[in-house]
């Protein structure tokens, strides 16, 4: 009896020791694929190595909206545009007219309201659920993919690492980023945006003597009281590769550490930029000086606001648009549209003989033109 009692007490003591090794983390999580219970410091709270495409974890967006930048792609859920092969997720561009016919782009009506839950249009803004093509405003000429964890996983504070290879091809726009689960401080950019990695697929896009295509990646924070007042120039960082050895040549690790004191970005464990919260993002953006009388949307939040809420993960391959590719940059063959053009998508499509060969769509299932993601991992602080 004494031996049994001793064993019970010993095992209970061991359990206390094991439990005491968990140092509670300031990280918070939510969602169907988020861990339950106490979050411990250093705990891995999300991981996908892409042994398969988990649709419960990654929701596909279905929209024509253009990402707020009048981009030229139609995001859809099909295995031509998103698939897993040999442990890698591919987000792949295809040509819309390959399935609809060329005439449909200038005369057809595309309605993407679906009857099944997974087929519903996810963003109706900017005619995102239905468009009618005309000779001057073609229906989105490219199909691509955008996936997100909005329902499955969101977190506040932690470290995220994504190993990815950016695509090669003119006017391709890969992005890995985070958006707020709830717009606690209002619509964009009042509730913030965290861009872990953005790049351009052009091999030889040059501005002011610098390759801003595949040899450059960027990380950015967006924040401000309204779209016309955005403090991102104070929190935008870029890193360039060695000339001739762009980020499209191999997989690279893109990571950030997000704490109650700030956000720091890394590429292959090398610092790309850091944002310390200081007295807050209102002061960082200088909004009181730039727009006197504007109300601070974060006045009732913490000093880290708007980056004191849970964010979810997004990965996508966009194409073109009227914001990200500067008109003043030089590119072999030129740029077929201007950012101020009222028919930018049409101009882009009409210039396809210039850019389409650079995508190499007929080689190796166009993997070179795809955003390739090896893994996504998130740890608690």
Predicted regions and their residues:
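GH16 jelly-roll
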Residues: 20-381
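Cleavable N-terminal signal peptides of Sec/SRP-targeted secreted and luminal proteins
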Residues: 2-20
């Amino acid at each position: 009896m004494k031996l049994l009692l001793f064993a019970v007490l010993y095992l209970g003591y061991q359990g206390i020791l094991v439990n005491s090794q968990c140092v509670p983390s300031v990280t918070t999580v939510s969602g169907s694929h988020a861990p339950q219970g106490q979050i411990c410091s250093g705990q891995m709270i999300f991981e996908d190595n892409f042994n398969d495409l988990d649709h419960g974890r990654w929701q596909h967006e279905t929209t024509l909206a253009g990402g707020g930048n009048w981009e030229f792609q139609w995001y859809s859920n099909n295995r031509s545009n998103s698939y897993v092969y040999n442990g890698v997720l591919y987000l792949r561009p295809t040509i819309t007219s390959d399935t609809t016919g060329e005439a449909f782009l200038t005369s057809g009506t595309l309605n993407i309201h679906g009857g099944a839950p997974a087929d519903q249009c996810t963003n109706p803004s900017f005619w995102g659920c239905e468009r009618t093509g005309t000779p001057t405003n073609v229906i989105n000429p490219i199909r691509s993919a955008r996936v997100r964890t909005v329902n499955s996983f969101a977190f506040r504070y932690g470290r995220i690492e994504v190993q990815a290879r950016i695509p090669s091809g003119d006017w391709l726009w890969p992005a890995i980023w985070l958006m707020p689960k709830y717009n606690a401080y209002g619509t964009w950019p009042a509730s913030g945006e965290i861009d872990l990695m953005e790049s351009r697929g052009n091999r030889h896009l040059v501005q002011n003597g610098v390759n801003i295509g595949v040899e450059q990646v960027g990380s950015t924070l967006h924040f401000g009281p309204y779209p016309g007042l955005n403090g991102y120039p104070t929190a935008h960082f870029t890193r360039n590769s060695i000339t001739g050895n762009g980020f499209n040549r191999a997989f690279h690790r893109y990571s950030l550490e997000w704490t109650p004191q700030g956000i720091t970005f890394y590429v292959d464990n090398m610092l790309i930029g850091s944002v310390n919260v200081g007295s807050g993002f209102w002061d960082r953006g200088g909004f009181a000086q730039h727009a006197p009388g504007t109300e601070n949307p974060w006045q009732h939040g913490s000093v880290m606001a708007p980056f004191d809420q849970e964010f979810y993960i997004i990965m996508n391959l966009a194409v073109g648009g009227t914001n990200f590719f500067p008109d003043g940059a030089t590119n072999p063959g030129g740029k077929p549209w201007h950012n101020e053009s009222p028919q930018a998508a049409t101009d882009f499509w009409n210039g396809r003989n210039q850019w389409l060969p650079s995508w190499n769509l007929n080689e190796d299932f166009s993997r070179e033109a795809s955003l390739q993601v090896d893994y996504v991992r998130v740890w608690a602080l």
